[in-house]
From Swiss-Prot:
The chain crosses the membrane at residues 5-25, 35-55, 88-108, 114-134, 135-155, 168-188, 209-229, 243-263, 275-295, 309-329, 331-351, 386-406, 415-435, 463-483. Keywords: Chloroplast, Membrane, NAD, NADP, Plastid, Plastoquinone, Quinone, Thylakoid, Translocase, Transmembrane, Transmembrane helix. This is NAD(P)H-quinone oxidoreductase chain 4, chloroplastic. Its EC number is 7.1.1.-. One of its GO terms (molecular function) is NADH dehydrogenase (ubiquinone) activity. It is found in: Plastid, Chloroplast thylakoid membrane. The keyword Lipoprotein does not apply. Its main location: plastid.
Length: 506
């Protein structure tokens, strides 16, 4: 279905285009640029919501609202955007989290104009990744969001920000090279004219050896972004040094690009290779759940502890993608949405706590619950959501992945038992490191010599941000059908591919 007005093009280009006007705003103070950026994000979020409510059909599993314009004629490079059940929930998540991250960044006063422009540029890049239907355009959008993150980290990070920023760009740039090489190989293989759009690539047939090589190239790139063990080491450093508004974008949106890429490209375009690699992806996902949980427990730094918990939770996404069941893949989508909300909330609360106590080391904290009861209550609620308390979105997501893999007919009983055991151990470990984090932060005697005047409780702005996050976290937990219909039709279509219906590793 092609749209009359290019709505998807508008929501993709509007943030970065509006950001180019920031230098022309009144340079006195930061108030104007804050409100300007927030209004731009709100407008984009409202239009995205309008697309979902009035233009998007939940019962169609093919692309909708397609914007297709020839860009570079000689190589058939098109500006082609489209939305379906994989991209719709993620562009809604992107718009929602970016708007809240912009509001959370209000305390920033140094070079605020550049900061807010970079946030808007990153906003456009992330929307572009989820909406692109051309492999070369997908690569360009993938690259577009890297530059703002590097600058946000290197200019507004902690003491080791340059090390973290360099490590981030090296990891992700290497992954991007694999996307470009594999994408161009797919486009030019057995074709006089390059076929760059996803629909054409899905209809191509490759020799199995070539498909395996292509799959491996994309897998490396997306495993870095997810991040998957052992390509995860950039994430704790990045989260540990970035400003918490940047962390909200990293945890809420950026790492979801890896899971999205695995489904959109590896699973849909290279299904034969996906069958071969799926047991290994599931095994790595199970190991990653336990590794992330155990490593998180050993972290003294609050943000690094939350970062390793993110690595652990992304293991469920990998298992869901490898399950070959509607329920498992739907659970992977739910986990990406759920963790996007919960992860953003945890990093926001970690940042607001740091603004008051000026330390991130858990062994230096303690006893601040009585002076900051609202922050204590919000942190506790968010941690309970992360450990998959029933009634929260995290519980629904992990249960769907757990049951989805358990009912899979693709694997032997022994392999299913192994992965289920790894998941169960991870689920047991999660409360240990999260409740330990709460105990070290809020209970016991106060170790820091801070007066009560410095330990201010949550402001109305901070309460509003967390309330906005808690609303979908609890809403999805109580009534999962708020989100499942967004991707259910598409998930069923993917799992009905002939290649997947005949899978069996007995």
């Amino acid at each position: 279905m092609i749209s009359d007005f290019p709505l998807l093009t508008f929501i993709t280009l509007f943030p970065i285009s509006a950001g180019l006007l920031i230098p022309f705003l009144d340079k006195k103070g930061n108030q104007l640029v804050r409100w300007y950026t927030l209004i731009i994000c709100l407008i984009d979020f409202v239009i995205t919501s309008y697309i979902f409510i009035y233009k998007y059909d939940l019962n169609i599993d093919t692309l909708q609202l397609i914007d297709d314009y020839a860009w570079v004629g000689p190589i058939e490079f098109h500006w082609k955007l489209g939305v379906d059940g994989l991209s719709m929930p993620l562009i809604l998540l992107t718009s929602f989290i970016t708007t809240l991250a912009t509001l959370s960044a209000w305390p920033i006063t140094r070079n605020s104009r550049l900061f807010y422009f970079l946030m808007l540029a990153m906003y456009s890049g992330q929307l572009g990744v989820f909406l692109s239907q051309d492999i070369l355009l997908f690569f360009l959008m993938w690259e577009l969001e890297l530059i703002p993150i590097y600058l946000l980290l290197s200019l507004w990070g902690g003491k080791r920000r340059l090390y973290a920023a360099t490590k981030f760009i090296l990891y992700t740039a290497v992954g991007s090279i694999f996307i470009l090489m594999a994408g161009l190989t797919m486009a030019f293989y057995n074709s006089n004219v390059p076929l760059l759009d996803f629909q054409s690539l899905a209809n191509k047939q490759y020799p199995l050896a070539l498909e395996i090589v292509l799959y491996l190239g994309f897998l490396i790139a997306f495993a870095v972004k997810l991040p998957a063990f052992p390509l995860h080491t950039w994430l704790p450093d990045t989260h540990g040094e970035a400003h918490y508004s940047t962390c909200m974008l990293l945890a809420g949106i950026l790492i979801k690009m890896g899971g999205y890429g695995l489904i959109r490209i590896n699973m849909e375009l290279l299904p034969n290779a996906h069958v071969i690699f799926s047991p290994w992806i599931a095994l790595i996902g199970g190991i990653q759940i336990i590794y992330g949980a155990l490593t998180s427990l050993g972290q003294r730094n609050l943000k690094r502890r939350i970062a390793y918990s993110s690595i652990s939770h992304m293991g469920f996404v990998m298992i869901g993608i490898s399950s070959f069941t509607d329920l498992g893949l739907s659970g992977a989508m739910m986990q990406m949405v759920s963790h996007g909300l919960i992860g953003a909330g945890l990093f926001f609360l970690a940042g607001t706590s740091y603004d008051r106590i000026r330390t991130l080391f858990l062994d230096q904290m303690g006893g601040i619950s009585t002076t900051m009861p609202k922050i204590f209550a919000m942190f506790t609620t968010c941690a309970l959501a992360s450990l998959a308390l029933p009634g929260m979105s995290g519980f629904v997501a992990e249960l769907m992945v757990f049951l989805g893999f358990l009912k899979s007919n693709a694997y032997s009983f022994d392999f299913i038992a192994l992965i289920t055991f790894l998941e169960a151990v991870g689920i047991i470990l999660t409360p240990i490191y999260l409740l330990s984090m709460l105990r070290q932060m809020f209970y016991g005697y106060r170790k820091l010599k801070l007066t009560n005047t410095l330990l201010l409780d949550a402001s109305p702005r901070e309460i509003f941000i967390m309330s906005c996050l808690f609303l979908p976290i609890i809403g999805i937990g109580i009534y999962p059908n708020l989100t499942i219909p967004l991707w259910n039709t598409k998930v069923e279509a993917i799992e009905q591919l002939n290649v997947f219906k005949s899978v069996g590793f007995k």
